[in-house]
Amino acid sequence: MAYYTDSSSSESEDFEDVINQVVAEEDITGAAWYDGHLSEEDSPGGKPRPKEQLPKDIVKMDARAYQLEMLEASLKENIICAMDTGSGKTHVAILRIKAELEEMPEGQVVWFLTPTVSLCAQQYAVVKAQIPSVQTKIVTGADKVDSWSSTTWDGALLNVKVIITTPQVLLDALLHGFVNISSLALMVFDEAHHCNKNHAYSRVMKEFYWESKTKHEPVPRILGLTASPVVRSDISSLKRLESTLDAVCRSPTRHREELIANSQRPALFSIIYNPKLQPYAAGFSESLTKLMAARNKLNILEDPYVVSLRAEISDRSRRKLEKAIKEKRTYVQDTMKSFCRRSMEMAKELGAWAADWFISEAIRLFLAGIYRQGASSKSFRDAEVIFLARVFQDANIEPPPPLTTHSGLSEKVQRIIEVLLNYDKDARAICFVKERATTVVLSHILTTHPEVSSKFRIGTMVGTSFVPGVKRDFLDLPETGGSQCLEAFREGRKNMLVATSVLEEGIDVPACNLIICFDKPNNLRAFIQRRGRARMRQSHLYLFVEDEAEADWEALEAQMKLQYEDEKREHERLEAIENSEALDYPEELRVESTGARLTINDAKSHLQHFVSTLASRKFVQTQPDYLIEKVSQGYQPGDQPLLKATVLLPVSVPQALRQVTSSRTWVSEKNACMDAAFQAYKALYEAGLVDDHLLPLRDRLELELEVRPGMREVRGLYNPWLSIAAACTQGDVPLCRRALKVSDGNNSELCEFELAIPVALPEMKPMVVWWDHRAQLTLRIDSDAVMADTDVRHADQTTINQQDHTSVLLSLAYGHRNMTIRDDCILRLVSKSGPLSMEQLGQVEFAPGLVTANGSSYLVRDERDQSRHPYYFESVLPSKPPAESIRKVYRGFDEDPTEATYLSVRKWPKKTGFFHRPCSPQHSPSTKPYAYILPAETTTVDRIPLVYAQMGLLMPSLVCYTELYLVAAELSRKVLAPLRISNVSMLVEAICAKSARTPENYERIEFLGDSILKTCITVNLAATKLHLPEGILSLMKDRLVSNARLCRAACDAELDQFLVTQQLVTKGWQPPYMSDLAKQDQEPESKRILSPKTLADVVEALIGVSFVDGGLPKALECIRLFIPESQPRPFSEVRDILFGAAEPKGMKLPADLQLLEQLIEYSFCEKALLVEAVTHPSYNVSGTVACYDRLEFIGDAILDYIIVEEVFALEPALENWQMHLLRTALVNADILGFLIMEWSYKQMGFEVCRANEGDSDSKSSGDSTSDKASPRLEQTEVPIPLWSFMRQSSAELTMEREITKARFEELRDPILEAMRSGTHYPWALFARLHAQKFYSDFFEALVGAIWVDAGPGFDACRAFVARSGVLPYLKRLLRDQVHVLHPKEELGRLAGRERVEYVVKETLKDDGDGKEWACEVRVGGRYVTDVTGCLFKEESRVKAATQACEILKRK
């Protein structure tokens, strides 16, 4: 029977008028045409693909030991895996499919069979989520497979590796020759107990599998899954099942203890009820009375079917007419009969009120469906629907009054209400019923019951299978949101489901603590399946039984009690065995040096602690697994079997230590496991993973991490002038003479000197100094040095005057100050333009022509001032200007005559020679035209050009600059002598802190050195500690590169005395005079307080200098110099070690990973490296050699190195903060996660579409042949993303990956738009994407694997990073000057000294379905903005910070 959709149209309208306005999309007498109440898989008008609406909560996939055992068994032979519901059969199938895909030849497929469409959708979701790297397809009857051709099948299976279908689909394909049994590599039979009699399962095996096997032709491997292989307690049925499936039934009996621990048993209660109809306040069901009356009033001669037959003139139609009238078998008659019968059953089962609501609701849905979809009176089939609708209208049936009491409810319903209200725990419940309609009606009753609804949030779940071409029964009250309810139940938003037997088996739901069998289970198997849903501790199971059927119930109850008793006896047997065996184990592990010891009693707890310290990654199981094996050797019947235990450690443990067996046999599983744990811990100690205190090595490393002190007292700065003065006092020292040229900002040479100093000067970069915020000067010191034979100290005064103009220059600039000016300055300047003398200062009286004589400018001096202060000359004034026009008047201004010549001058600067451009003056320009006024008659003019005075003023900067090079040269000569660094300029950069305000500081080169250090240490540790897990390697690396360790290295090497931290102070500055230095040499060594980070930064800067000077080899030498215990080896050597350690050698790449090499455009020489790189640490499957942890450890450093090298080499050179921003933007987990999701391979595939799909012309209202038309193939491109190749076995990771995939599909376009053309880096979008770290870990593991395979160079890795999009995005960020600063950091800068507060709250969504985050931003206690609707806490902060930045910048 057909059922129809909901509608809000008025029922009083004429149906023919309504119908004639709508063109029917499908024949309403055919398959269901209503899409409003159908799931996508049920709708024949749509694609039967449960894709977007698949449940997000995937079956738990953490492999337990007994599941791994079942996998091993299935790899050896065909098996039927018999395990309780909820114990993880599906995971065994997933592991088996993965193993098959690795070996499966091209052209074969894995065929996964499930008995129902619901299970097809369930298992499709699981396979798709767990094995996303291959094409997986689901095919059911809804795909119209009965009309598929050979071409259709070939297209549908193109590039498909796993196909999930109902058994009838496969059987039909085999029967018609579209699929050959030899093309199947593996067949998985879900709910394999159905394989009996004439079931499609059985026919596939008997008619095709066994026929081919008998002929010795290839046949697929078999894996059956079941929770109850014995049907109706018939043991012989097990033998038949094994024979039919050519498989042996296997249950993990070797792990019975663990299996029982993972399968909780609920307490069992029976509820006896009276099935008789209960009295109803509104009388016996009024609606049912009206419905039966309407049925009795039907006139068969008015039936549309009869009318249409009477209009035909043929013998066939006459025979049909006679039969229809005689038997009253028409659509209308059958529907009314069924409606009345089912309404009566509803009244008996649930009560009269329930029957009234059922009748009114069914009629409402039927009528509303016609309004929604329409029908045409041109077809007699539509005429039947219109006729039936008018019958319902004429019956005038109204909904019952609201349910306020138990009146009108059956005793059975009243009992379930009592059970629910009396249940005193936080419930997670399933109520099993028999009929589809009962689920809807009972759910409605419980939902509208005030007390029940306050305690339970109730949903429904029914089966969705149907046969295409058969009318759907609207009397089933089709529920609209089964999959949504199931998802809400999984997420905890609903805590009770009313469901049919569809939830008995197969479909994965969370563990429950309350199971209600509203209808008695049909057999023991159904009971076992339902009981398996109650896996929580202290669960309850209620069985409802009619008081008239107690005898039948007692027989079933006896079976169930027997089952319980068997399980209880098993528990008791295990306990008795453990108590009976004496623990005679003399062996112990003792460490003589520490006195530590370990016995068998402590071994399991120690081993558990060791595993928990291996890593702190999410989604990784942190506990050992134990396998129990019965030893058959020497076993006699009747003897207690002897056992051995094998402990399995996580894949991050070296393979040789990962599986350890007990040293002897035991009767008790417990003792065998303790023995295995002891042997395992002993092996770990011998391998060096446990220290001499018998504690995990990680614990000791964490304790040994050096704590960086707050500040540290170190040596004072090395003074090179003291060393030079000491050398000069000991004998003649040759002078180093160099040309010093001074030029302006236009590169015009202003003057030239000879710089003389009694020490060899290294090559010096040009010194750029700023005179003020507008003008700069450049001092170039030629690199070609001329060494004089003698020191001018011993020359006469005339010679000194001729060869040393330093004192004159100082007098020009500083003579008016309190500076002591003498002739014994170590650094001397000699003018190339002729001799300079003190007599030339203020030599002549002022005359206008003298100030700018010979094209030069000269200083003027005030002779009335005892210090003879110098001034810049500006103009001549014929008379004294008013005092109001002068910014500052001199003393005695008012007494001087008005009618006299005056000079307008500017004051000589107190401070200049800045290494960095100073800020422009902040004060507003003065309105007074004259800065200073001097009388012309008391003013004199220098006869030395102004540029020499400027040079004198720059002497502090020149001495400071020279001192930097002398300090660096001494550092190179002493501490860094083994490195033979040729570029002293870079050493100057490396030893200067930012606080010194020198021309350059170490921040840029330290940025490079930091990455070089971590890369060198990382690859060396990985190569020299092959047996250590990544977690321990990370701690060892952190210990070697920590600021505390580097600080200690700096002090141990006496590097601290070469670190420049204080800037040049010109106030009180004195030149380095020989006489003063002789006195200082007698003073004790000075001390200073420095930050340990500053000392550590200098070490990293020197490593960077070494790299620039001599590449990685010299950088390794520098690391060896400062951190001798690291003993770094050349990159070629460590790469060869790592490459040689890859196992197994020469392996063939698994078939499912061959596509990955094409995707990344790199073919591995050692395929084992690629397999290791794609293996997540949760993948604890037998045979796994290693996981990607160690490769990720390497790849993280290599990726950082590649990015740092790229940004460091950019021209023009970037500032340190710019490089930090770019590195942060390019190697964070968010962008790497996004890029690995975006990076995909487009594989060709075909979708099977209806012939009339998308073709409105073929959908005529009366045409019923369109369903028979042949389907068509539509070519598609199936994306296979890079992340899908990661092998993992974690339920939580799979769920997180599926949820992240949905977010990625939502955010992909806006993120790509921002990356391609946005002005800002998409921090907020990435925060919403919230890619977990395993995405970036996978990316980095691939980088590490490529380097080990292709190294020791980085070209292959750099090419991979470029293909990923990281390097192109770097160019885009630079080209378009994208704003990269993180919003939270930017907000902190905009706020200045005001405090920024993020007030984050977790709230319910507006629809009450789930939670979201909101954030309010306050700056300085003031509200700025707020955001809502965020998925994550950090996202709310980032979004709020982004908005706050925009608001503050506008202000």
From Swiss-Prot:
Belongs to the helicase family. Dicer subfamily. ATP binds at M83, D84, T85, G86, S87, G88, K89, T90. Keywords: Antiviral defense, Antiviral protein, ATP-binding, Helicase, Hydrolase, Magnesium, Manganese, Metal-binding, Nucleotide-binding, Repeat, RNA-binding. It comes from Cryphonectria parasitica. Residues 603-704 form the Dicer dsRNA-binding fold domain. This is Dicer-like protein 2. One of its GO terms (cellular component) is nucleus. Mg(2+) binds at E1192, D1337, E1340. GO terms for biological process: defense response to virus; regulation of defense response to virus; siRNA processing. It is an enzyme of class 3 (hydrolase). A motif (DEAH box) lies at residues 190-193.
